């Protein structure tokens, strides 16, 4: 069998989704209630990085980009993550704040997609979280000019050791180029795998102070 033939075998990789369905009668009025339940179950199932989410943005040419970051907080105002403000994603959000998020809980045969608008967090919010991080992570935030080209990993490691020595006394200061974003909750879609590819999808859309719920075809 040639390498090409082996690659073509991916077309036959599939499985049935058998972990149960999602019914309209079981849905809460508030999508955050269901999100919290699903996130809790993802944690209880000991999934690797249950708070990992794909963040999708677009650049000024409408070219989409995606990357995985960690959810650090959520409430009725939105979902929060932190990043280097000089990063590609931060620049893209500055140009176009429309963002989508995806939580891929494959083991539970579930996905959650969020669509909303990103806004910068206040310095107070950022500082509070920054100083809750492990000290080495705080120093690491100073090291990297995110998304810039570098010639070798050793540059980062040397810079880390240099800054660790510099900041050995007292608190590590908050970098001016480090911050966070809150993604507003405009649409939230819940996907539960189903047998025979008859998956269950429910879309919550915000309408004024309430949520409209629709079942979508798989």
From Swiss-Prot:
Positions annotated to bind FMN: 67-72, 82-83, 88-89, 111, 146-147, 191, 201
Reported cofactor(s): FMN
GO BP field: pyridoxine biosynthetic process
Broad class of enzyme this protein falls into: oxidoreductase
Entry GO MF terms: FMN binding; pyridoxamine phosphate oxidase activity
Pathway note: Cofactor metabolism; pyridoxal 5'-phosphate salvage; pyridoxal 5'-phosphate from pyridoxamine 5'-phosphate: step 1/1; Cofactor metabolism; pyridoxal 5'-phosphate salvage; pyridoxal 5'-phosphate from pyridoxine 5'-phosphate: step 1/1
Cofactor binding remark: Binds 1 FMN per subunit.
Annotated InterPro entries: Pyridox_Oxase (IPR000659), Pyridox_Oxase_CS (IPR019740), Pyridox_Oxase_N (IPR011576), Pyridoxamine_oxidase_dimer_C (IPR019576), Split_barrel_FMN-bd (IPR012349)
Entries under PROSITE patterns matching the protein: PYRIDOX_OXIDASE (PS01064)
Keyword Ubl conjugation: no
EC number: 1.4.3.5
Keyword Methyltransferase listed: no
Assigned keywords, A-Z: Flavoprotein, FMN, Oxidoreductase, Pyridoxine biosynthesis
Amino-acid positions noted as binding substrate in the UniProt annotation, renumbered to this chain: 14-17, 72, 129, 133, 137, 197-199
Catalytic activity: pyridoxamine 5'-phosphate + O2 + H2O = pyridoxal 5'-phosphate + H2O2 + NH4(+); pyridoxine 5'-phosphate + O2 = pyridoxal 5'-phosphate + H2O2
Family classification: Belongs to the pyridoxamine 5'-phosphate oxidase family.
Summary of the function given for this chain in its UniProt record: Catalyzes the oxidation of either pyridoxine 5'-phosphate (PNP) or pyridoxamine 5'-phosphate (PMP) into pyridoxal 5'-phosphate (PLP).
Quaternary structure, from the entry: Homodimer.
Listed name of the protein: Pyridoxine/pyridoxamine 5'-phosphate oxidase
Origin species: Escherichia coli O139:H28 (strain E24377A / ETEC)
Lineage start: Bacteria, Pseudomonadati, Pseudomonadota, Gammaproteobacteria, Enterobacterales
């Amino acid at each position: 069998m040639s390498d090409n033939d082996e690659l073509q075998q991916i077309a036959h990789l599939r499985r049935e989704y058998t972990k149960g369905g999602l019914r309209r009668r079981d849905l809460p009025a508030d999508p955050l209630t269901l999100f919290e339940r699903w996130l809790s179950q993802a944690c209880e199932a000991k999934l690797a990085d249950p708070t990992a989410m794909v963040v999708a943005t677009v650049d000024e040419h409408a070219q989409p980009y995606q990357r995985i970051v960690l959810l650090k907080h959520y409430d009725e105002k939105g979902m929060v993550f932190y990043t280097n403000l000089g990063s590609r994603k931060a620049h893209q959000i500055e140009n176009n704040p429309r963002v989508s998020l995806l939580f891929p809980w494959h083991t539970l045969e579930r996905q959650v997609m969020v669509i909303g608008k990103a806004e910068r967090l206040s310095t107070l919010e950022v500082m509070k979280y920054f100083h809750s991080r492990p000290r080495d992570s705080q120093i690491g935030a100073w090291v990297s000019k995110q998304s810039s080209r570098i010639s070798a990993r050793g540059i980062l490691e040397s810079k880390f050791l240099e800054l660790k020595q510099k900041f050995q006394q007292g608190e590590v200061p908050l970098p001016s180029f480090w911050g966070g974003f809150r993604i507003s909750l405009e649409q939230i879609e819940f996907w539960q795998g189903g047998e025979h590819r008859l998956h269950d999808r429910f879309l919550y859309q915000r309408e004024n102070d309430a949520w409209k719920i629709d079942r979508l075809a798989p």
